[in-house]
Design a protein with these regions (language model features):
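N-terminal amphipathic/basic leader segments beginning at the initiator methionine
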Residues: 1-40
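Glycine-rich phosphate/pyrophosphate-binding loop regions near the starts of catalytic domains
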Residues: 23, 31-158
């Protein structure tokens, strides 16, 4: 009997990093999360405090401080005159203004649904940038989570 030598090569492929949609991996805290934040959030909303990439922000104030939180869950996420990103920024700024405060800083958290088109996420980010620049506020911290398809409504913002 003749023996045949089998040549098997095992290769570990590089992970896929370019996606057309949000995947569960984008919320895992790993490579995909960091890529989404670096190319998306940090790149679009860049400022010195956000660029520190901490889970919080350290701010110095000499007088009273007003703060608020609000969550935005709207369908559709794009509507005549804006999108959920602009609504979230302007709504939070309005809440602070109703306290008599002059808004300077905001936090920003996303709950993204698996399958959200990356193009839609970018459009929401650009709406956030536009609204925050118009109001003169900086996004200084935030969080991003991804939920299974069918467990959210594209994007929730706090």
């Amino acid at each position: 009997m003749s023996q045949q030598k089998l040549s098997i090569q095992l290769n570990c492929p590089l992970p896929k990093l370019d996606f057309d949609v949000i995947t569960l991996g984008h919320g895992s805290g790993g490579v995909l999360t960091h890529r989404l934040l670096d190319t998306g959030v940090f790149n679009v909303l860049k400022n010195d405090l956000l660029n520190e990439q901490h889970d919080g922000a350290i701010l110095n104030f000499s007088g009273p401080v007003a703060f608020t939180t609000d969550s935005y869950v709207v369908t559709p996420i794009f509507f005549p005159g804006g999108n959920i990103g602009e609504l979230a920024v302007n709504g939070s700024i309005n809440d602070l203004a109703m306290c008599g405060a002059i808004p300077e800083y905001l936090s920003l958290s996303f709950i993204l649904e698996e399958g959200l088109r990356m193009e839609e996420f970018w459009e929401v980010l650009l709406g956030i940038k536009k609204a925050s620049e118009e109001a003169g506020v900086s996004i200084v911290t935030g969080d991003t989570k991804v939920v299974d398809k069918g467990k959210g409504d594209k994007v929730f913002i706090n």
